[in-house]
Amino acid sequence: MTTHSANTPEPLPPPLAARIRLAHAYFQHIADAHSIDVLHIKGYAFSQEIYRKGRYSSDADLLVRPSQVDRFVKILLADGWRIQAHFETGSVFEHAMTLYHASWGLTDIHRFFPGLGRHGDYEKTFDRVWAARHTRFIAH
């Protein structure tokens, strides 16, 4: 345990951009450890040509395989995350929920993406998007 004397200032929290980028790595680690398929979407997951320098993201957005969303959320809740908005109350499309963690900040967990696929067909839609995924370093 680290202790601080009266003369030692408390460490500064990491900048928001660093915390969000590292949150993406954290989520990938959790997903890999539990064999859950996640796609990092929006924000820092976009290429730098699209997500231009000087623009900042305030959360980490994930698209999770629909059949694995409940298990992924349970794992996150057990790791200290709290629900800010449920699927049913967070969006008119009921496609995403928002979680908060005191260290990591906010994340939006998407179970589908509005406009992609039809109700009841989201697993097949995820398969198509999954097959076209690319690897990108977000936090390094």
Question: How would you name each of these model-derived features?
Answer:
Residues M1-S58, V64-H140:
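Conserved NTP-donor binding/palm subdomain of two-metal-ion nucleotidyltransferases/polymerases, i.e.
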